[in-house]
Regions:
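Non-catalytic accessory segments flanking enzyme active sites
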Residues: 71-123, 169, 189, 196-273
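Beta-strand C-termini and the immediately following turn/loop, strongest in propeller blades
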Residues: 33-41, 51, 84-90, 98-100, ...
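Asp-box/WD-like beta-propeller blade repeats and closely related beta-sheet repeat scaffolds
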Residues: 2-41, 45-48, 57-64
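Short loop/turn segments that connect beta-strands within beta-propeller blades
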Residues: 5-9, 51-55, 99-103, 146-150, ...
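A short loop-to-beta-strand structural motif that recurs across blades of beta-propeller domains
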Residues: 2, 46-48, 94-96, 141-143, ...
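Surface loop/turn motifs at the tips and blade-to-blade linkers of beta-strand repeat domains
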Residues: 14-18, 63-67, 110-114, 158-163, ...
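Generic long, charged, amphipathic alpha-helical segments
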Residues: 152-173
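Extended catalytic-interface subdomain
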Residues: 34, 42-98
Length: 273
């Protein structure tokens, strides 16, 4: 990792070696957290806090994942109000958090690791929104909990588990939340407003396709960027206005003419045996 002053263009810190490349900044633009990767095992196992006023050799260790079956990452909430340390193994996860404007505080545990319990955390206002498989929810569900006491005994489901629908992802925005769902092999993007007045899927064309959310770092926006491709549509990047429900094509891959018209493609279902 390198630290660069964006105003002067000066690199103000020498490279920090053996990191995963991920980092999360506090709101003071002075402290950030980064992940140390063991150079032998390549396991992400430690989180350090850096202060740009001091050499990185003095960075304090804030978390050490000692269980060799787990790796870790550090991330920010979409609102930039919270910083998370995520511990995860094949079937189990665990998340800690602090407020971004309190970088020297101790990370608090949301829910201690329990074998088989997987969860990921988003934040909106004074609640965490958690995609999880609690109570044998193998397709996952979404729960809500107050930040003041976020242990799973207080989780309240806001999107129930469904046996035929897999919840894959959750994106949080100021006015909307977007759920990536998969049903019968096809992905759908569900858009819901926080006030409950809107609940709809982004419209798509075609019998078979692939749709996915792209990088959407902005919290205060009504625009969702996503990718789409199908047998009839080349790989495309689109921007969807969640208020007006209009699509705007930003980029599309050029495809050479193969003398096959789009109407010549169709989906055929086959029963597995």
């Amino acid at each position: 990792l390198y630290v660069k002053d964006l105003i002067t263009g000066e690199v103000i810190d020498t490279k920090i070696k053996n990191t995963s490349g991920g980092s999360a900044w506090s709101t003071n633009s002075k402290n950030f957290f980064y992940v140390y990767k063991n150079p032998t095992t390549l396991r992400s196992e430690k989180i350090f806090r850096h202060d740009t006023d001091f050499p990185h050799s003095e960075d304090p260790l804030v978390f050490h994942e000692k269980d060799e079956t787990f790796s870790i990452s550090v991330s920010e909430s979409k609102s930039l109000e919270y910083i998370f340390i995520n511990s995860y193994s094949t079937l189990t996860s665990e998340v800690r958090f602090i407020k971004s404007d309190e970088p020297l505080s101790e990370f608090q545990l949301i829910q201690k690791r329990t074998t088989g319990l997987e969860y990921s955390v988003n934040q909106f206002e004074d609640h965490f929104y958690i995609v999880n498989n609690k109570d044998n929810s193998f397709n996952c569900k979404i729960s809500k909990v107050s930040i003041t006491d976020p242990s799973y005994k207080n989780w309240v489901d806001i999107m129930e588990h469904r046996e035929s629908v897999l919840i894959e992802d959750l994106n949080i925005f100021k006015d909307y939340w977007v759920v990536t769902e998969r049903e019968q092999g096809l992905t759908k993007l569900r858009v819901q407003s926080w006030d409950g007045s809107e609940n709809y899927f982004i419209p798509v064309e075609g019998e078979t396709y692939d749709i996915y959310t792209g990088l959407n770092p902005s919290f205060n926006t009504i625009k969702l960027r996503y990718g789409f491709t199908s047998l009839k549509t080349p790989s495309s990047v689109l921007e969807f206005d969640m208020l007006d429900q209009n699509n705007k094509l930003l980029k599309q891959t050029d495809v050479l003419d193969n003398n096959l018209g789009r109407e010549q493609y169709s989906e055929i279902g086959v029963v597995a045996v």
